[in-house]
Amino acid sequence: MSATPDTHPAADAATHPTADTATRPANPVARKTIISGLSIHTQMSSVAGAPIVYLLGDVADNSPIQVPEGVSLVNVGVDLWEENFSPWCAPRVFAKGPNFGDGAQKTLDTLINQVIPWAESELSELPAYRALVGYSLAGLFSLWAGVTQAGVSPQVTRGCQPDNTPAATFQRIGAVSGSFWFPGLLDYVDQQLSGGAVGLTHAYLSLGDREARTPNPQIMHVRENAELLASKLQNAGITTTFELNRGNHFQNVEGRMQKALDWLVK
């Protein structure tokens, strides 16, 4: 479920070098930059081909979120969540909240065409897989992106001619306490999945067990929608789990994110 859409919890490809991987530093390589308004903070594993988790939210240098050794982490800080994570325009669900925009496609394009090439520019090999993980509206975006992403062949990222085997940008997604109540989401996911493979292999969905206990007529269906979405993804051949956590939307945000990451990279 999404928390107040106007409040976001704190959490905060590519060319490749010719250097031998044995010369790379033993500790993760950290870099920071801003790309098209997105704050990027990378901690890249020195292991060649290491999976990469793209974590949506506020970049936090001392984030308690941890990934195992041999997994890289890219924090992506995004402002104006109701605009930049919303896939299409929709009216506000809280009296004092903003309406939703339609900036998700622009955000996804920026991730694929600018953020990933920069973040992965010093890698010696493509990652084994990429995971996209977010909380609340960022979780909605992760799910939407997972069934929307356009595939590109691996050769394209290496500057070669494309073959006929497209590969999804993100193979795994985590939608943690996601805004599964968002209008039109169920129909959209149905439409995308009915078109064939979307490139996802794993999907993690979760909610707090009190998130649906609200008089808000839109949000009260969040658990029902989450369970339906998990079933749709599983039936499409995507390894999927739906987890209920104790509490409301704002409870133990970091712990819930950690559980998602642990499942996605196990």
Describe every region a protein language model picked out.
Residues 4, 8, 12, 16, ...:
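Asp/Glu-rich intrinsically disordered low-complexity tracts
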Residues 2-5, 24-266:
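Non-catalytic cap/lid and distal C-terminal segments of serine-dependent acyl enzymes
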